[in-house]
């Protein structure tokens, strides 16, 4: 009888150890998957898809004749990169609002996820990575040009359609143009891929 009890106890312990080993293996596998997700720019957070961040690649080429002064001298340019939940308020945002921090925040309201400023220098290129949450729908880019050409001081991109190839733009004397990324048509028509017709005012 005692021998049978010992055998039963040994069997139970063996099952418990096996179960723990299997659990540890599953935990290790889960950790490995998590590291792969982070390495590919996807941060896994349970329960709320809006908290899953992806990396958006943005490249900006600053032309040699960047943000020209009244005498034709190239100047630096402050570019602003916006991660947005929607684009309606960005569409309505005016140039004076964009250049004033408080007015800018008030104009964009709850649509604004984040904004980042980059100082561009003539003839330089910039590779920028934006963290974009799942509830964001657009990437906005605006430039504080000295004398902006009409609506060409800002661009808007559909972020979900732009992840694969990223966003590439050019910054010039008084305007932006876009070469990569899916533009939001009612803010940035396809004509914004070219500088044809752009005339800078002194």
Regions found by a protein language model. Name each.
Residues 14-40:
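Bacterial Sec signal peptide processing site at the extreme N-terminus
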Residues 57, 150-154, 158:
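Gly-Asp-aromatic-enriched flexible segments
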Residues 48-52, 131-136, 161-163:
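A short, structured loop/turn motif at beta-sheet edges
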Residues 58-70:
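Short amphipathic, basic-aromatic surface patches that mediate peripheral association
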